[in-house]
Amino acid sequence: MYYPFVRKALFQLDPERAHELTFQQLRRITGTPLEALVRQKVQEKPVQCMGLTFKNPLGLAAGLDKNGECIDALGAMGFGSIEVGTVTPRPQAGNDKPRLFRLVEAEGLINRMGFNNHGVDHLIENVKKAHFDGVLGINIGKNKDTPVEQGKDDYLICMEKVYAYAGYIAVNISSPNTPGLRTLQYGEALDDLLSAIKNKQNELQEIHHKYVPVAVKIAPDLSVEELIQVADSLVRHNIDGVIATNTTLDRSLVNGMKHCDEMGGLSGRPVQLKSTEIIRALSAELKGRLPIIGVGGIDSVIAAREKMAAGATLVQIYSGFIFKGPQLIKEIVNHI
């Protein structure tokens, strides 16, 4: 109930500054009795997906808690899963500021963060301290200065390091803010990456005596033909799940709005329909052979239900959480 007042204050600030201040406060309470301040009781609605039991179908999408600093505080709000990252082998600063913009009228965000994070080792130290009782996903990417041709090495380094601590691993090949990254979604480059990831997963399963599922996160800007090829590759390589979708480069729904011409990926309500269409097409192609985690513009119970009706087993929120606050979690979980 109090979030509209908090939002009003935060929205007076630069978006990245608002994020930093919010996380400063969440860091203070995470892992302490003060977590009670943000705790919400939500209904238990268990879902089986990728061989894991999720206590409810709603997750936090990657990008909000890049370094795994506030896992417990965010978990207290009622998420069934939290995806931290994107994390890279080495720390990196990301792109120059400003790099995050609100499109308030559209309830959307444009970001060109560029995988700013403190590196995989730092993330793991934070994950070790967390007591979240839901499923923890760790989203991995490549460093900006790693040539795309050697990009798979970065994913394998991250996989090796996070495997013991992850409920599932998300492979991000769809951010528009790392030059060349999206080329990994196509043809031989995708097959080469997925083959290496599957081999590494099998190797790590032997070492750790546990199977950690791998999901691949795709872009909403794929054509139908490209989507069919991606689906075929995911099935052929026995990938465990697909996260659909990342942010879009399409600005058709926000033309003329403040910040609409900023470079970067657009998320929030403007990507809602596009991501749902991708999920529907993907579901028709996959025919249940691997599960879909639906993300993109979910800002209400109806939007979440639309993703699930289109074929998603689980859903995630990010921008909707920024615009609507923790109450959205409770509404979606209790009524989905």
Curated annotation (Swiss-Prot):
Coiled coil: none
Enzyme Commission code(s) on record: 1.3.5.2
GO cellular component annotations of the record: cytoplasm; plasma membrane
UniProt binding sites for substrate: K66, N111, R112, M113, G114, F115, N172, N177, N246, T247
Co-factor remark: Binds 1 FMN per subunit.
UniProt-listed PROSITE patterns: DHODEHASE_1, DHODEHASE_2
CDD domains recorded: DHOD_2_like
Membrane-crossing residue ranges in chain numbering: none
GO-annotated biological processes: 'de novo' pyrimidine nucleobase biosynthetic process; 'de novo' UMP biosynthetic process
Subcellular location: Cell membrane
Catalytic class of the enzyme: oxidoreductase
Keyword entries, A-Z: Cell membrane, Flavoprotein, FMN, Membrane, Oxidoreductase, Pyrimidine biosynthesis
InterPro entries on file: Aldolase_TIM, DHO_dehydrogenase, Dihydroorotate_DH_1_2, Dihydroorotate_DH_2, Dihydroorotate_DH_cat, Dihydroorotate_DH_CS
Molecular function terms from GO: dihydroorotate dehydrogenase (quinone) activity
Biochemical pathway: Pyrimidine metabolism; UMP biosynthesis via de novo pathway; orotate from (S)-dihydroorotate (quinone route): step 1/1
Matches recorded under PANTHER family: DIHYDROOROTATE DEHYDROGENASE (QUINONE), MITOCHONDRIAL, DIHYDROOROTATE DEHYDROGENASE (QUINONE), MITOCHONDRIAL-RELATED
Assembly and oligomerization: Monomer.
Family: Belongs to the dihydroorotate dehydrogenase family. Type 2 subfamily.
Stated name of the protein: Dihydroorotate dehydrogenase (quinone)
Species: Enterobacter sp. (strain 638)
